[in-house]
């Protein structure tokens, strides 16, 4: 089921003061600046094997929220993994961590928000957790929530 993007400012106006918006100032890296979808989560630290495995599955228009504990030491997503997500139907990635291949990411039809960049590769041991609540930017991302993202920020809605 595809969830259409909506302007996050309009969502905030509609929801009011109890809105769940991410306070973390993530940068826009993907070629799709507005995206929305059901949340799937991964928690991993400087290791991207688990998130690559998840992005290998059909995304059905979902958003993968990746909590890399804010580390900018290694990139969790680069052009190959982002293209894998795009090819498997994910609408976007929200990353509490770093990406690489930034100039190529801008050309891919997938939304990507992250803290910053680092050309260093991550490890690939498969360490991490999937489908668990993750928290960053003052908001908890729970699997099954709906994430809306645009140039103004990220809003999370529980259906």
Swiss-Prot record:
Gene3D superfamilies membership: Ribonuclease E inhibitor RraA/RraA-like
InterPro entries: RraA, RraA/RraA-like, RraA/RraA-like_sf
Residues passing through the membrane, by range: none
Cofactor note: Divalent metal cation.
Keyword line: Lyase, Metal-binding
Subunit comment: Homotrimer.
The protein's name: Putative 4-hydroxy-4-methyl-2-oxoglutarate aldolase
Phylogenetic placement of the source organism: Bacteria, Bacillati, Actinomycetota, Actinomycetes, Mycobacteriales
